[in-house]
Curated annotation (Swiss-Prot):
Pfam families: Ribosomal_L22 (PF00237). This protein binds specifically to 23S rRNA; its binding is stimulated by other ribosomal proteins, e.g. L4, L17, and L20. It is important during the early stages of 50S assembly. It makes multiple contacts with different domains of the 23S rRNA in the assembled 50S subunit and ribosome. The gene is rplV. It comes from the Bacteria. InterPro entries: Ribosomal_uL22 (IPR001063), Ribosomal_uL22_bac/chlpt-type (IPR005727), Ribosomal_uL22_bac/org-type (IPR047867), Ribosomal_uL22_CS (IPR018260), Ribosomal_uL22_sf (IPR036394). GO terms for biological process: translation. Keywords: Ribonucleoprotein, Ribosomal protein, RNA-binding, rRNA-binding. This is Large ribosomal subunit protein uL22. One of its GO terms (molecular function) is rRNA binding. One of its GO terms (cellular component) is cytosolic large ribosomal subunit. Belongs to the universal ribosomal protein uL22 family. Part of the 50S ribosomal subunit.
């Protein structure tokens, strides 16, 4: 049985989030949560929340052993980019891209 959680329009860079997501994929839920809890960057906190949501979704299914769940897949897609401008010297301006991410976590029952 699989469980899924999706977080859209998260204000974290998709590139940096994928670096953290690669470390979590294939781990047991408890081990993945401990890893994310003590990883000192913003994407880890966002992924931790999505993982908790997927775990809560799994517990609602019924007949599922939540402790035996494994992180089957973590998909990080790029969301829309917010464009901002920063004033610079001599009347110029520089474009700043604030990137967003769509994060999907899929849990499955099974062995690590």
């Amino acid at each position: 049985m699989e469980s899924k959680a999706i977080a859209k329009f998260q204000r974290v860079s998709p590139r940096k989030t994928r670096l953290v997501a690669k470390n979590v994929q294939g781990l047991g839920v408890e081990e993945a949560m401990n890893l994310l809890r003590f990883t000192p960057n913003k994407p880890a906190g966002v992924l931790y929340g999505v993982l908790k949501s997927a775990l809560a979704n799994a517990s609602q299914l019924g007949g599922v052993d939540v402790d035996a769940m494994v992180v089957k897949e973590v998909v990080v897609n790029e969301g829309p980019t917010w464009k901002r401008f920063m004033p610079r010297a001599q009347g110029r301006a520089t474009k700043i891209n604030k990137r967003t991410s769509h994060i999907t976590v899929i849990l499955a029952e099974g062995q690590e």
